[in-house]
């Protein structure tokens, strides 16, 4: 192992001890991923499942600039991770993404264009679900990250498309798919949200909003955390973003996308 990777391994281990990098272990447990409605008087009683260990993603080979992987860049990123990682679950995000950071590019003030399917001919679906999804984007947009969202009527012009499904055949209630280039810059994304739990119960207002917040978190590049007070925990029991959700998203967008360690087999 090269000295650079050895130093980072020690650093990441220390960081993991604080922010809970059990994501490797979580991969084996993620079949138990359930997102439930917010705790409290208005809590949902319908479990919202999201069994996939990470958002589905695909790579567009040859897109974008080549990854930045020189020693100086990696040392800088790792130093910033070590100094700023306290109070975040960035270590778990790295573990889930094969030690890489995936995020949307800096857009110079241009918002991400969001299209939400306006009509769904599905039993029990109502238009009241649409503002719940909008609210999820707005809440993340106010989380201190350099992302703005606008809502468009034409799906062809959208960067992100949100659609509805009656229920999934697999035990999930929401799914996020995004594509990234060779540098781990996210290029486009889609979210699918279920109207019914896989057992047939209607996903109520609290459950729909919770899964929307959770999936938009995946959309911007986050993954699961063992912090049960955060919206990105596998079993969501909160109504809003936690300080750790906000801090992790902010740190993610302070750093460049791409691997934070040398890839095995790279000729350096």
Label every PLM stretch briefly.
Residues 127-215, 219:
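Metzincin-family zinc-dependent endopeptidase catalytic domain
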Residues 106-110, 156, 185-187, 226:
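A short, polar/charged loop/turn motif at coil->beta-strand junctions and beta-hairpin connectors
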Residues 68, 84, 123-135, 202-211, ...:
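Soluble non-cytosolic domains of exported or imported proteins
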Residues 114, 140, 214-217, 232, ...:
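Buried hydrophobic packing residues in well-ordered domains
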Residues 5-125:
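Disordered inhibitory propeptide/activation segment of secreted metzincin zinc metalloprotease zymogens
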Residues 2-45, 178-207, 223-268:
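Metalloprotease/metallohydrolase-associated module, dominated by Zn2+-dependent proteases
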Residues 116-118, 164, 194-195, 234:
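Pocket-edge structural micro-motifs
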Residues 89-91, 95, 121-126, 169-173, ...:
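Short, solvent-exposed loop/turn elements at domain surfaces
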């Amino acid at each position: 192992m090269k000295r650079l990777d050895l130093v980072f391994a020690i650093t990441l281990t220390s960081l993991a001890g604080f922010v809970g990098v059990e994501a490797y272990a979580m991969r084996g447990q993620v079949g138990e991923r359930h997102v439930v409605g917010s705790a409290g008087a208005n809590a949902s009683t319908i479990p919202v499942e999201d069994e996939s260990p990470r958002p589905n993603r695909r790579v567009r080979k040859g897109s974008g600039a080549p990854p930045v992987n020189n020693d100086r860049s990696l040392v800088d990123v790792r130093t910033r991770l070590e100094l700023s990682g306290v109070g975040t679950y960035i270590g778990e995000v790295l573990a889930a993404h094969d030690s890489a950071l995936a995020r949307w590019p800096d857009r110079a003030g241009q918002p991400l264009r969001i299209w939400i399917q306006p009509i769904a001919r599905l039993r029990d679906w109502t238009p009241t679900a649409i503002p719940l999804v909008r609210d999820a984007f707005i809440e993340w947009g106010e989380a201190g990250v350099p992302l703005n969202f606008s809502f468009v009527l034409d799906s062809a012009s959208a960067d992100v498309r949100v659609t509805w499904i009656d229920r999934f055949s697999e035990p999930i209630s929401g799914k996020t798919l995004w594509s990234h280039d060779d540098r781990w810059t996210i290029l486009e994304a889609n979210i699918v949200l279920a109207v019914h739990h896989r057992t047939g119960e209607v996903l109520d207002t609290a459950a729909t909003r919770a899964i929307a917040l959770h999936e938009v978190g995946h959309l911007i590049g986050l993954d699961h955390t063992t912090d049960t007070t955060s919206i990105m925990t596998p079993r969501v029991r909160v109504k809003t973003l936690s300080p750790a959700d906000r801090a992790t998203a902010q740190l993610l967008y302070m750093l460049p996308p791409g691997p934070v360690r040398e890839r095995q087999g790279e000729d350096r």
